[in-house]
């Protein structure tokens, strides 16, 4: 069986709908079972309530991202890292808009999300491989676990999470997909459904094959109604830059999509 792992939807309803439709299409063909989300359901696009409602309607369990927990607890800032004063300003605008427009029931749903989830595909026996889900890292959901982190850093995080040889830990937050194995543990960044930053505008998620042992890790990209998302942002009071970022896949020079 394969698990579908999605992360960083960021209120992009058209992207989420397309990803869930793709997962549904693969259920029998690719033996896709449960779907889990790795947080940051809200922020940056105008559908926070609709995204959280759809996640709950579909019975998709998951964890809190930094955006979810800060909105739910009325913090002053989302805990996002900005690389310029302008980016910091945009971050504050998005966070303020989300807090102002989110419904009480949505806020409550975000508040109920746990920090971490541990899954055992074949029962609860500790000899089975474990899949651990966090948003940023086992220590902080605001920590950026990028692909250039050292093997020693990965080993430290695995030890902190209590992982053993054959286990897998999945996370998001950076919006850039990658995977590697260090000391027998698989490390997987799922990328982003609703706000990719790797130059590819398409929504991204991961399929993890899990049984007696962890098998393949497949990165999936899905085209969605980008113009609907762009139009939704432009019709809201959110900055037009967020629409431009969606078109460019989060980078000034988007990659060529095959």
What kind of feature is each model-predicted range?
Residues 51, 58-118, 128, 140, ...:
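Active-site neighborhood of divalent metal-dependent phosphoester bond hydrolases
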Residues 10-15, 43-46, 67-73, 168-181, ...:
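Active-site environment of divalent metal-dependent phosphoester hydrolases
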Residues 1-60:
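N-terminal active-site segment of His-dependent metallophosphoesterases
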Residues 1-4, 119-132, 182-186, 215:
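Beta-strand-turn-beta hairpins that frame and shape the catalytic cleft
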Residues 6-7, 35-40, 61-66, 134, ...:
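Active-site neighborhood of phospho(di)ester-bond hydrolases with catalytic His/Asp-centered motifs
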Residues 148-188:
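Anionic-ligand binding region
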Residues 23-32, 121-128, 161-165, 207, ...:
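Glycine-rich phosphate-binding loop signature in dinucleotide/nucleotide-binding domains
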Residues 180-258:
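Acidic, His/Gly-rich catalytic cores of divalent-metal-dependent hydrolytic chemistry
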């Amino acid at each position: 069986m394969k698990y579908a792992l999605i992360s960083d939807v960021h209120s992009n309803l058209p992207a989420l709908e397309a990803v869930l439709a793709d997962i549904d299409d693969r259920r029998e063909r690719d033996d896709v079972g449960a779907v889990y989300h790795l947080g940051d359901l809200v922020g940056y696009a105008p559908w926070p309530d609709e995204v959280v409602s759809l996640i709950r309607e579909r019975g998709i369990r998951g964890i809190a991202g930094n955006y979810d927990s800060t909105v739910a607890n009325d913090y002053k800032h989302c805990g996002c890292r900005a690389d310029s004063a302008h980016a910091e300003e945009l971050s504050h605008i998005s966070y303020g808009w989300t807090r102002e427009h989110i419904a009480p029931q949505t806020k409550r749903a975000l508040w109920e999300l746990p920090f971490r989830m541990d899954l055992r595909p074949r029962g609860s026996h500790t000899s089975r491989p474990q899949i651990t889900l966090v948003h940023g890292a086992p220590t902080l959901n605001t920590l950026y676990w990028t692909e250039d982190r050292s093997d020693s850093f990965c080993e430290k995080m695995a030890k902190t999470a209590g992982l053993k040889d054959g286990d897998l830990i999945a996370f998001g937050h950076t919006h850039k997909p990658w995977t590697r194995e260090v000391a027998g543990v698989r490390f997987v960044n799922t990328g982003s459904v609703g706000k990719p930053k790797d130059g590819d505008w398409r929504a991204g998620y991961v399929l993890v094959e899990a049984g007696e042992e962890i098998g393949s890790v497949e990165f999936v990209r899905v085209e969605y109604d980008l113009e609907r998302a762009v139009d939704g942002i432009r019709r809201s009071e959110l900055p037009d830059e967020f629409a431009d970022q969606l078109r460019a896949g989060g980078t000034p020079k988007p990659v060529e999509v095959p």
